[in-house]
UniProtKB/Swiss-Prot annotation:
PANTHER family attached to this UniProt entry: HTH MERR-TYPE DOMAIN-CONTAINING PROTEIN (PTHR30204:SF93), REDOX-CYCLING DRUG-SENSING TRANSCRIPTIONAL ACTIVATOR SOXR (PTHR30204)
CDD domains, alphabetized: HTH_MerD
PROSITE patterns in alphabetical order: HTH_MERR_2 (PS50937)
Residue span, HTH merR-type domain: 3-72
Entries under Pfam families matching the protein: MerR_1
Organism: Pseudomonas aeruginosa
The protein's name in its UniProt record: HTH-type transcriptional regulator MerD
Amino acid sequence: MNAYPVSRLALDAGVSVHIVRDYLLRGLLRPVACTPGGYGLFDDAALQRLCFVRAAFEAGIGLDALARLCRALDAADGDEAAAQLALLRQFVERRREALADLEVQLATLPTEPAQHAESLP
């Protein structure tokens, strides 16, 4: 097992140590072991989860929703995990629809500056 500290986990995921520590406090991540000095050690599965959580957060999924999913996954509660995944998939689908609607609206915007009242006599 590859085990590495918070600083390496953060570096590999491209986030700050502060983000990793925040996610630890929220229960989104858990160390797989601790050093004799009490520092958490993380494995490749933790890195994968961190990358998933960060991508989901950047896509607009709230940390509370992600924490519910992570708790269900950590508890090996298959029914709850499936329910949380279904909710996230619904959110993603709604977001895709909203972005598609926005794309249509963007296509209809004029590319030239509008001439307003200042051009009136």
